[in-house]
Amino acid sequence: MESVADNKKAEFTMKAIVVTDQAAGTAGMTLMERPVPKAAINDVVVQVHASGFVPTEMEWPSTWTDRVNRNRTPSIPGHEMAGVITSLGYGTTGLWVGQRVFGLTDWYRDGTLAEYVAVEARNLSALPGDVNFTVGASLPISGLTAWQGLFEHGRLQAGQTVLVHGAAGAVGSMVIQLAREGGAYVIGTGRAADRQRSVDFGAQEFVDLENDVLEDVGSVDLVFDVIGGDIGKRSAELIRAGGTLVSIVGPVQGGASNCRMVDFVVESNRCQLNEIVQRVRDGRLRTNIGNISGLDDAFAALNPTGRRKGKAIIRIRP
């Protein structure tokens, strides 16, 4: 039988996936009890219903250190989620306890692979009642990365040709759909097994990077690079004068002097989240969700033996 002390402990602790060893990566994840966070000034605390996860988080300095490079482990990974607000910090406006929300959390704070998370209110957007928590959690990083890469950094215009690497992935599939809606002609790339999925999301051509010649696509106006390396360099050479390569994997060398090379880190933006979720509601934007698992059995989903397909989602609450 549970004691009063056990019940009190349950009120102040939560389950969370924690990392302590950068060398171990996702294999070093541990499920443990952590204190439930409190809402600081301009914060809210959200009861997490579903969390997304990006495997490269294990390579990000922000997972392991704070902004002045001090070790901040044990830390909780995961930075995109959907859930319900349980408390408001001083100064918070426009949100309320019990509200359904989704959003992107600060890279340098404990994340969303937990039952609760504290997050700045400005990083959250209302999650409409007709969008479930699993879908909501799949949108922030992939959707905002695609939106900012195309429209802020890529300056996409109707009639342009866009080359999208990783076309069947969580980000690439969003890029394809938003670029098509923006009036672009879209060429996707990937492996042979990705062809049909890329076409299903809207790619008008597809390049199998293992068997086709990338340069056969001709000149393009915009490259969205999620690969880097040699593919990134070769892609830069395809850009027309005045065109742009946007990268989420670091700077890319090469390209003509009259082309723009932009590498960026996605940022939270409430207005853009609103635009993205409205497109989901309207049927104009489809999510690309892969494995879905619970918090207690998340390790298999976060450490897959095969190639990842789509966004990994951890359901924190049934």
Please provide the spans of the model-predicted regions.
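C-terminal hydrophobic helical "lid"/dimerization subdomain
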Residues: E2, K8-F12, L273-P318
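A short acidic, Gly/Pro-enriched loop at the edge of an enzyme's catalytic core
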Residues: E215-L222
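Mid-domain Rossmann-like dinucleotide-binding core that forms the NAD(H)/NADP(H) cofactor-binding site
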Residues: A137-D208
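Glycine-rich beta-strand-centered segment in the early N-terminal region that forms part
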Residues: P35-F53, W64-Y108
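Short, polar loop motifs at secondary-structure junctions
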Residues: G190-D194, N211-D212, S247-Q253
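Glycine-rich phosphate-binding loop and adjacent beta-alpha segment
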Residues: V226-N288, I292, I316-P318
